[in-house]
């Protein structure tokens, strides 16, 4: 089976993008270089094609019960047009994925829309339908990933850029709020969300309107690929599913991964009982700044200054904004305090590092 492609794939080819495989999708890694794209988002605005993210619609009388059982946050708190971040956990409280859940506006299809990570939409659909059927819930579940496209417009200029094409209502959206808005004649779900640490929106639209939406925005800002998306999210300390946690290779609970804020025990989600006594985990997700030359990479050991292994790097890069090496990973809780001196073992040599609570930037 070949790689899946975005409804904007032809636009990216015409623009000369370089491509990479990610989660079973063939997606742009960059258009004009990661450094330039990263800087554009930090200083002005950039547009990302994120159509590789899944979209699952849930509706029906028991839609809220189903969402409440399978995501860790409390969807009953959401009014139409509200969104929240959540984890999806198994019976043992291990994170399968993380997601954003929308209680959709009244004029958007479905009661809920949630966004699994790239390549996870089929598994999420199966999990939702299996649970629905096992518990005899009256809800419809539809994998609409191929029916929609999705872009993220991020950066300090992004809200004004989108508002100029969609109306000033974009400025009225609070954080994690969404509304149905017309962009270039296409009805879109526009949400005040993002994965860069900057102001901006994410826009969901019918796949057949993808080109019109992209052209209306991309002609006036920097197209960006997955390379810059990765360096931007690392500077802010955001998790990447499959990289910073994985149910098979790197099983973590939400409390280990630093997203206990997205856990609502009263919601009765799958895995709640297993998590009841784990809100003080043995290891914690932390940021690292390297004090010597080198770059922390996935899988590198984190040690004490004396050389005792206390954790592992899960993500790392040379920060384009800071010009310094940064990393994310897990260390024993006794060594997780901000400012703690540790080391990262790079090719057999322990390089001094400092535990640094993300975000790494002063914003």
Curated annotation (Swiss-Prot):
Family named by the database record? Belongs to the GcvT family.
User: Which UniProt key words apply to this protein?
Assistant: Aminotransferase, Transferase
Name this polypeptide is given? Probable aminomethyltransferase
One GO cellular component this record assigns the protein to is: glycine cleavage complex
Q: Name one Pfam family in it.
A: GCV_T
Its domain of life reads Archaea
Q: Assembly and interactions?
A: The glycine cleavage system is composed of four proteins: P, T, L and H.
Q: What class of enzyme is it?
A: transferase
**Biological process annotations from GO:** glycine decarboxylation via glycine cleavage system
The answer to whether UniProt assigns keyword Transferase to this entry is yes
The EC designation for this entry is: 2.1.2.10
Q: Which reaction does it catalyse?
A: N(6)-[(R)-S(8)-aminomethyldihydrolipoyl]-L-lysyl-[protein] + (6S)-5,6,7,8-tetrahydrofolate = N(6)-[(R)-dihydrolipoyl]-L-lysyl-[protein] + (6R)-5,10-methylene-5,6,7,8-tetrahydrofolate + NH4(+)
Species assigned in the record: Halobacterium salinarum (strain ATCC 700922 / JCM 11081 / NRC-1) (Halobacterium halobium)
Which PANTHER family did the record assign?
A: AMINOMETHYLTRANSFERASE, AMINOMETHYLTRANSFERASE, MITOCHONDRIAL
Which GO molecular function, any one, fits this protein according to its record?
transaminase activity
- Which ranges of the sequence are coiled-coil? none
What does the UniProt record say this protein does?
The glycine cleavage system catalyzes the degradation of glycine.
């Amino acid at each position: 089976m070949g790689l899946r492609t975005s409804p904007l794939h032809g636009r990216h080819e015409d623009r000369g993008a370089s491509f990479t495989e990610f989660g079973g999708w063939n997606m742009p890694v960059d258009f004009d270089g990661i450094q330039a794209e990263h800087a554009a988002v930090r200083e002005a605005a950039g547009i990302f094609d994120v159509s590789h993210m899944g979209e699952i619609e849930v509706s029906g009388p028991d839609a809220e019960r189903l969402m409440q059982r399978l995501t860790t946050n409390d969807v009953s708190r959401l009014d139409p047009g509200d969104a929240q971040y959540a984890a999806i956990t198994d019976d043992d409280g291990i994170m399968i994925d993380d997601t954003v859940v929308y209680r959709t506006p009244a004029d958007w299809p479905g009661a809920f829309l949630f966004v699994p990570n790239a390549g996870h939409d089929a598994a999420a659909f199966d999990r939702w339908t299996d649970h629905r059927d096992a518990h005899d819930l009256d809800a419809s579940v539809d994998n609409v990933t191929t029916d929609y496209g999705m872009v993220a417009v991020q950066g300090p200029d992004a809200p004004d850029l989108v508002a100029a094409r969609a109306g000033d209502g974009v400025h009225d959206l609070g954080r994690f709020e969404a509304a149905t808005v017309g962009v270039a004649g296409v009805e879109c779900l526009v949400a005040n969300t993002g994965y860069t640490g900057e102001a901006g929106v994410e826009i969901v639209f019918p796949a057949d309107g993808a080109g019109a939406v992209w052209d209306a925005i991309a002609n006036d800002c920097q197209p960006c690929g997955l390379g810059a998306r990765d360096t931007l999210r690392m500077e802010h300390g955001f998790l990447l599913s499959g990289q910073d946690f994985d149910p098979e290779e790197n099983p973590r609970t939400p409390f280990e991964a630093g997203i206990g804020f997205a856990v609502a025990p009263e919601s009765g989600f799958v895995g709640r009982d297993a998590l009841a006594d784990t809100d003080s985990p043995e290891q914690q997700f932390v940021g690292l700044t390297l004090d010597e030359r080198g770059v922390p990479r996935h899988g590198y050991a984190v040690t004490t200054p004396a050389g005792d292994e206390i954790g592992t790097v899960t993500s790392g890069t040379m920060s384009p904004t800071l010009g310094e090496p940064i990393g994310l990973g897990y260390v024993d809780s006794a060594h997780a305090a901000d400012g703690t001196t540790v080391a990262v073992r790079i090719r057999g040599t322990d390089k001094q590092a400092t535990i640094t609570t993300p975000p790494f930037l002063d914003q």
